[in-house]
Protein backbone atom coordinates (compact mmCIF):
# COMPACT_ATOMS: atom_id res chain seq x y z
CA UNK A 1 0.00 0.00 0.00
CA UNK A 2 2.90 2.34 0.70
CA UNK A 3 4.02 2.57 -2.94
CA UNK A 4 0.47 2.76 -4.28
CA UNK A 5 -0.35 5.57 -1.85
CA UNK A 6 2.90 7.36 -2.71
CA UNK A 7 2.13 7.37 -6.43
CA UNK A 8 -1.48 8.34 -5.83
CA UNK A 9 -0.41 11.16 -3.47
CA UNK A 10 1.81 12.77 -6.09
CA UNK A 11 -0.91 12.41 -8.72
CA UNK A 12 -3.47 13.92 -6.35
CA UNK A 13 -1.31 16.91 -5.40
CA UNK A 14 -0.50 17.62 -9.04
CA UNK A 15 -4.19 17.49 -10.03
CA UNK A 16 -5.68 19.22 -7.00
CA UNK A 17 -2.90 21.40 -5.69
CA UNK A 18 -2.22 22.03 -2.00
CA UNK A 19 -4.39 20.15 0.48
CA UNK A 20 -4.53 19.18 4.14
CA UNK A 21 -3.59 15.76 5.46
CA UNK A 22 -7.20 15.20 6.53
CA UNK A 23 -8.55 15.90 3.03
CA UNK A 24 -5.81 13.83 1.41
CA UNK A 25 -6.65 10.82 3.59
CA UNK A 26 -10.39 11.27 2.94
CA UNK A 27 -9.76 11.32 -0.80
CA UNK A 28 -7.50 8.24 -0.51
CA UNK A 29 -10.34 6.44 1.33
CA UNK A 30 -12.70 7.27 -1.53
CA UNK A 31 -10.11 6.16 -4.09
CA UNK A 32 -9.64 2.74 -2.51
CA UNK A 33 -13.33 2.57 -1.52
CA UNK A 34 -12.48 1.75 2.08
CA UNK A 35 -12.41 3.73 5.31
CA UNK A 36 -8.82 4.09 6.46
CA UNK A 37 -7.05 5.90 9.22
CA UNK A 38 -3.47 6.82 8.54
CA UNK A 39 -1.46 7.90 11.55
CA UNK A 40 0.62 11.06 11.21
CA UNK A 41 3.90 9.07 11.31
CA UNK A 42 2.63 6.63 8.69
CA UNK A 43 1.59 9.54 6.48
CA UNK A 44 5.10 10.96 6.88
CA UNK A 45 6.63 7.64 5.81
CA UNK A 46 4.36 7.47 2.77
CA UNK A 47 5.23 11.07 1.93
CA UNK A 48 8.95 10.22 2.06
CA UNK A 49 8.35 7.23 -0.21
CA UNK A 50 6.63 9.54 -2.73
CA UNK A 51 9.55 11.96 -2.57
CA UNK A 52 12.01 9.11 -3.19
CA UNK A 53 10.01 7.68 -6.10
CA UNK A 54 9.62 11.00 -7.88
CA UNK A 55 12.82 12.75 -6.84
CA UNK A 56 10.92 15.75 -5.54
CA UNK A 57 9.93 17.33 -2.25
CA UNK A 58 6.41 17.38 -0.92
CA UNK A 59 6.41 20.56 1.12
CA UNK A 60 4.22 21.53 4.06
CA UNK A 61 2.82 24.98 4.80
CA UNK A 62 2.25 25.20 8.58
CA UNK A 63 0.11 28.33 8.14
CA UNK A 64 -2.49 26.57 5.99
CA UNK A 65 -1.64 23.01 7.14
CA UNK A 66 -1.41 22.00 3.49
CA UNK A 67 0.96 19.73 1.61
CA UNK A 68 2.02 20.65 -1.90
CA UNK A 69 4.53 19.96 -4.66
CA UNK A 70 6.40 23.13 -5.44
CA UNK A 71 8.05 22.04 -8.69
CA UNK A 72 5.33 20.09 -10.51
CA UNK A 73 7.14 20.56 -13.83
CA UNK A 74 9.98 18.35 -12.62
CA UNK A 75 7.49 15.49 -12.50
CA UNK A 76 5.15 16.30 -15.38
CA UNK A 77 8.01 16.72 -17.87
CA UNK A 78 9.64 13.37 -17.03
CA UNK A 79 8.38 10.51 -19.26
CA UNK A 80 8.71 7.78 -16.63
CA UNK A 81 6.96 9.85 -13.95
CA UNK A 82 4.17 10.78 -16.38
CA UNK A 83 3.67 7.09 -17.17
CA UNK A 84 3.35 6.27 -13.45
CA UNK A 85 0.85 9.07 -12.94
CA UNK A 86 -1.15 8.09 -16.01
CA UNK A 87 -1.28 4.51 -14.74
CA UNK A 88 -2.84 5.74 -11.51
CA UNK A 89 -5.30 7.92 -13.42
CA UNK A 90 -6.28 5.02 -15.67
CA UNK A 91 -6.86 2.67 -12.75
CA UNK A 92 -8.94 5.39 -11.09
CA UNK A 93 -11.30 5.39 -14.08
CA UNK A 94 -11.63 1.60 -14.11
Predicted segments with their positions:
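Short, basic/aromatic recognition patches that contact phosphate-bearing ligands
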Residues: 1-90
Amino acid sequence: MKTEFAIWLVSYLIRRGPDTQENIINEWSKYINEDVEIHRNTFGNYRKKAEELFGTEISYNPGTKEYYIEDKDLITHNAMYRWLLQSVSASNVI
